[in-house]
Amino acid sequence: MSSGKILPRRQAVPVLYTRGTHYEVGFDMGRTFGSMIKNFLILSKPLNETYLPLYQSPKGRQIYNETLGSVKDSFPQYVRELEGVADGAEVEFHKLFLLHLDEILPQALKHQPRSKNQPTGCSTIIVNQKNCRLLGHTEDALTETLNHYYFVVAHIISDKPQGKYNVKEEHFMSLCYAGHLPGYTMSHNHHGLVFSINTISAELLRSGKTPRHFITRALLATSNVDDAFRVLKDAGVGAADACSINFTFLADPRQMCYNVEMAPSPDRKNESHLNIKEVPLGEHNYHVNQFDRIRQDQANDLMISSSISRMQTFGAYNPPMSEQDVRHMLGDVSGGVYCVWRENNSCDEVVKTIAVGIFDLSARTISLYSDNPSETEPHCRLPLLYK
């Protein structure tokens, strides 16, 4: 029985290994973590206080249906995957899809105030040196998400090509929030893709377009840099909302890393608006939860204040050159209310850092932390999938 209670930080990193069709993999996620998913649906304030009431209105239902229809046209396999999660967990599908719509519904209805008026987000550090290639990432979220996440290692083989990119096989590992599809946090796949996501709260959102969570889910199937850019561009539809993607491919002969800022098209083009930054060998990069290069209005002042504070914290350090440097920076608590590592050891804190992952691109491993990486050792260090 789900209690709807927020627990103190657990020293645990759940990992599920599963294989099958999209529906079967989703069902396994739902069945395995059903109690966690049900609990999260009880606790989620944005879902219960904003998304569900708006969904009950005629206009809200219209926006929900047109966006679901758009996703079904492009990525029917991922809708089946989410249906599997709902069936396995024995929860209602529309609640899970509303979580994936995030702020699209309230923004399309000009609902005020926007529910996500909290400094949620995450921080990513890329180190691309000859002798040290790392991608480190904090996953920060509303406190109800604490202890409501898991890693999924999935191998999906379809009997015929799936979706707009005709994908037949996927093999990946991804951190998932309870009830969410893989791909919108930190992930890697068997083609050597490694990536992390920074949420950006754009003022301009588009209903009937592709929610960022489904674009990054499709990113999990990509096999090279051009393929990744094609998925992010989402020609014919385009992104409904905004985020930043930090990524590289292990086999890239250039050893190039990238940060891509993705936003809805300001010109109503049927494709995403992208700004691509290369991070070549010998360089490093930081990204948090604001546009650094795209010139679009942003909706969440607290998220912007938090982003500015975290970037100032990173800027006070010498450029990172080692895994220890990255651990110290991602565990930094010097920024006051908007520090990098967020934990005040009480359940009344609005936002917490729920997990940290550090990808070692040279050793081809990921180190997973559920607590401050500057003070603790990783729970585990897992080999990256690679063909």
UniProtKB/Swiss-Prot annotation:
One of its GO terms (molecular function) is beta-alanyl-dopamine hydrolase activity. Its main location: other. Its EC number is 3.5.1.-. It catalyses: carcinine + H2O = histamine + beta-alanine; beta-alanyl-dopamine + H2O = dopamine + beta-alanine. The protein is synthesized as a 43 kDa precursor which is then self-processed into a 15 kDa alpha subunit and a 30 kDa beta subunit. Processing appears to be necessary for beta-alanyl-dopamine/carcinine hydrolase activity. The beta subunit carries the beta-alanyl-dopamine/carcinine hydrolase activity. GO terms for cellular component: axon; cytoplasm; cytosol. Optimum pH is 6-8. Changing G121 to M/V: Impairs self-processing. Disruption phenotype: Lighter pigmentation of the body. Females have higher levels of short chain short chain hydrocarbons (CHC) relative to long chain CHCs compared to wild type females. It holds the Pfam family AAT. Coiled coil: none annotated. In the cuticle, catalyzes the hydrolysis of beta-alanyl-dopamine releasing dopamine and beta-alanine; dopamine is a metabolite involved in the pigmentation and sclerotization of the insect cuticle. In the photoreceptor cells, catalyzes the hydrolysis of carcinine releasing histamine and beta-alanine contributing to the recycling of the neurotransmitter histamine in the optical nerve system. Also, regulates the cuticular hydrocarbon composition in females. This is Beta-alanyl-dopamine/carcinine hydrolase. It comes from Drosophila melanogaster.
